[in-house]
């Protein structure tokens, strides 16, 4: 049974938000306008689906009334089953849409990819993963901005960080967090032996300055000449920035830009996102183990996926899904994989009757 009173309240809130966003006071405050627009965007699918269901219910009532009319009964009888199926579909959609939302889901996202076990092959795999996510971002019309890039001497990346901006970025990429494993024959392998390597992906919701306050006295900032693979200079200026957050010991480096100020701004962006994630994880630790084991929590030590090149196979270990289309997935065709993870998470939430708080998945 759908909570009609709750749906009507959401409808009223949507109308209120549209009114507020037109007020001069809000238009003069960009941060407040952004906050209200984020809320409006989040509840709009509920309002649209509820309006469609109300329209379907109205048509069902009209058709039932028309059954007693000899001129209209045949048409009404033909239309009713289709309308009733549509009502059931919309009711199921609304049930999912009303699940608790993670406030991070509409945020932009910082991704950090680091090579793990496997030496040179791990660095190449880290580069493959970054390229895969960039290609996926292209299909979603998201923007990718490199924040930091450390190349390995034999190719690939020791680590790479990027900010991905667009609609509902975090709600899709949250599932990429964890340890990714690759099984393939390296180009340098003369006997055809399969090597196993890993790379770790961290997925962080972008933090605004209002989300995380950082005191300048808690920062230790050092400047150096930027460096590339094999000690080669990326540029000749002292523009590379390293920031250490003294209370937590976190260290962030950025050397992607020629401007020291731009590198510092990018490093601060990553630091804020890491601190926001740290605080949210502390809060989650106080919650049930059941919630923490849900798909999409992005635990960094969790083995999430294996990419087997000889078999053209990708296996997601969290939901036991195997797809024999690695060649397409590594080129950014992640829609089927991420869609299955989102569906699985929604099913978990429905089965458990919904859970509140920041690890939950929005419906689209």
Curated annotation (Swiss-Prot):
Pfam families assigned to the protein according to its UniProt record, in alphabetical order: PCRF, RF-1
Modified residues (N5-methylglutamine): 232
Annotated coiled-coil segments of the chain: none
Record note on modification: Methylated by PrmC. Methylation increases the termination efficiency of RF1.
Family: Belongs to the prokaryotic/mitochondrial release factor family.
Function field: Peptide chain release factor 1 directs the termination of translation in response to the peptide chain termination codons UAG and UAA.
Protein name as catalogued: Peptide chain release factor 1
Species of the source: Sorangium cellulosum (strain So ce56) (Polyangium cellulosum (strain So ce56))
Highest classification ranks of the organism: Bacteria, Pseudomonadati, Myxococcota, Polyangia, Polyangiales
């Amino acid at each position: 049974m759908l909570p009609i009173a709750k749906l009507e309240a959401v409808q009223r809130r949507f109308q209120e938000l549209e009114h507020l966003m037109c007020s001069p006071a809000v238009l003069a405050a960009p941060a407040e306008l952004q906050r209200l627009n984020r809320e409006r965007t989040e509840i709009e699918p509920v309002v649209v689906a509820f309006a469609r269901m109300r329209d379907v219910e109205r048509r069902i009532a009209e058709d039932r009334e028309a059954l007693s009319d000899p001129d209209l009964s045949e048409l009404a009888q033909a239309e009713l089953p289709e309308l009733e199926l549509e009502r059931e579909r919309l009711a199921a959609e609304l049930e999912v849409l009303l699940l608790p939302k993670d406030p991070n889901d509409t945020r932009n996202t910082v991704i950090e990819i680091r090579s793990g076990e496997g030496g040179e092959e791990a660095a190449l795999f880290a580069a493959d993963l970054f390229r895969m996510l960039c290609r996926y971002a292209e299909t979603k019309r998201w923007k990718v901005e490199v924040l930091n890039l450390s190349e390995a001497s034999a190719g690939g990346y020791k680590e790479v960080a990027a900010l991905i901006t667009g609609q509902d970025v975090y709600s899709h990429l949250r599932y990429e967090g964890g340890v990714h494993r690759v099984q393939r024959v390296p180009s340098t392998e003369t006997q055809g032996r399969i090597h196993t390597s890993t790379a770790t992906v961290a997925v962080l919701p972008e933090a605004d300055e209002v989300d995380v306050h950082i005191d300048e006295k808690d920062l230790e900032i050092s400047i150096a000449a930027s460096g590339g693979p094999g000690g080669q200079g990326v540029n000749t200026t002292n523009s590379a920035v390293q920031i250490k957050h003294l209370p937590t010991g976190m260290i962030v480096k950025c050397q992607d830009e020629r401007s020291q100020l731009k590198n510092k701004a990018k490093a601060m962006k990553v630091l804020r996102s890491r601190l926001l994630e740290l605080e949210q994880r502390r809060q989650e630790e106080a919650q049930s183990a059941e919630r923490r084991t849900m798909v999409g929590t992005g635990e960094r030590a969790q083995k999430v996926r294996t990419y087997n090149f000889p078999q053209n196979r990708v296996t997601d270990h969290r939901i036991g899904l195997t797809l024999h289309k690695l060649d397409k997935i590594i080129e950014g065709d992640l829609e089927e994989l991420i869609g299955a993870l989102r569906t699985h998470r929604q099913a978990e939430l429905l089965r458990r009757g919904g859970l509140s708080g920041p690890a939950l998945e929005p419906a689209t």
